[in-house]
């Protein structure tokens, strides 16, 4: 099947399929004489695996590790569990950071009069960083993380 059919069948966009090939997450597709990519059932199965792992929030590096474990029939389930538990810990850190941001914003919004006056603690906090928020930005996750 061509890339469009593989995309439709797997639920992974053609653009992402090309990207996953480029970064080595999936094997390069076979090519026709006219250089079109062709995919088989195993390729689509792998793409579905990748899509599901992405849906669960695993990083590309974690997916590489999971794919290697999936392909290794002699793997120990404890290795797979370790990847999952590490991911759960990351998710819990993100949740805590988002909850802290929510508390801070609720506090600031509660002190903003929301009227015609220009004074606003939300703007003041963004401009000056004056609120005591115990967080730092983690560029890997795009959210603040607790210090």
Curated annotation (Swiss-Prot):
Residues 1-69 form the HTH merR-type domain. The keyword Disulfide bond does not apply. This is Heavy metal-dependent transcription regulator 2. CDD domains: HTH_CueR (cd01108). It comes from the Bacteria. NCBIfam families: CueR. One of its GO terms (biological process) is positive regulation of DNA-templated transcription. Keywords: Copper, Cytoplasm, DNA-binding, Plasmid, Transcription, Transcription regulation. GO terms for molecular function: copper ion binding; DNA binding; DNA-binding transcription factor activity. Transcriptional regulator involved in acid tolerance. Binds copper. It contains a N-terminal DNA binding region and a C-terminal metal binding region. Residues 3-22 bind DNA.
